[in-house]
Amino acid sequence: MVMRSYRDYTPNARKQDIPEEGRHKPCKKLTRGKISGNGRNNRGVITSRHRGGAHKRLYREIDFRRNKLDIVGRVGSVEYDPNRNAFICLINYVDGDKRYILHPKGMGIGDIVLSSPNASISAGNALPLTKMPLGTIIHNIELKSGRGAQLVRSAGTVAKVIAKEGRLATLRLPSGEIRLVPRDCLASVGRVGNVDISNKGLKKAGSKRWLGRRPKVRGSAMNPVDHPHGGGEGRTSIGRKKPLTPWGRVTLGKRSRGKKCINPLILRRRKSS
């Protein structure tokens, strides 16, 4: 019997590869099960359209508090996390504890990390804002001391310390917002890794389905009962002066963000639509 071999001819087959970060099994002690809501609320009503059908995932417990103070840790592995677009690092501490942290750009296996007020200004170290010089680039920032990081956690993002006065530090966030944060809050030095995630192509519709994103149907292709743009014979226009949402509100150009209460900690808000 003759075996005939063919070269791959589709972009997905030719260019897709499993990155080195995706070849590690997660630490079992730091994982737990995760149930997808598929865009439904507790009554089963769709509250977020075009969601559902994602690949089954395990949730990795990430240390956003960085409260292992003055204990040296070493990077054991850099791993893929399906629950976020940044990579994560498994840190092996000298006391035997293991924790996951966000992977800073430039950090590799075997590097040393430390969470301490006296830590050096190097990628991955966590220290209070009061100990950071002006111009330091940071990520994984707390809004309240001890609560855990809430800002600048996405892949490739970075904030900068631009001023310190009294008990507050002034930060420039990736969105362009400038806000005040208490100086005793912890932050990690450096930029979040996986900077080129925005350049990654999905290559096929199935890749989107693995991520839990379902197809988006045009309103003009629906029936009138389903969308204000629906109905008509053939490919007709939407029949409206302005495009509308499925719930009948004007969209595409009209500002939809509600007015915000005055927050004295926000010096300049980000640009919003």
UniProtKB/Swiss-Prot annotation:
Residues 14-24 have a biased composition (Basic and acidic residues). NCBIfam families: rplB_bact. Part of the 50S ribosomal subunit. GO terms for molecular function: rRNA binding; structural constituent of ribosome; transferase activity. Keywords: Chloroplast, Plastid, Ribonucleoprotein, Ribosomal protein. It comes from the Eukaryota. HAMAP family: Ribosomal_uL2_B. It comes from Adiantum capillus-veneris (Maidenhair fern). One of its GO terms (cellular component) is mitochondrial large ribosomal subunit. One of its GO terms (biological process) is mitochondrial translation. Residues 1-51, 213-248 are annotated as: Disordered. InterPro entries: NA-bd_OB-fold (IPR012340), Rib_uL2_dom2 (IPR014722), Ribosomal_uL2 (IPR002171), Ribosomal_uL2_bac/org-type (IPR005880), Ribosomal_uL2_C (IPR022669), Ribosomal_uL2_CS (IPR022671), Ribosomal_uL2_dom3 (IPR014726), Ribosomal_uL2_RNA-bd_dom (IPR022666). It is found in: Plastid, Chloroplast. Belongs to the universal ribosomal protein uL2 family. PANTHER family: LARGE RIBOSOMAL SUBUNIT PROTEIN UL2M, RIBOSOMAL PROTEIN L2. This is Large ribosomal subunit protein uL2c.
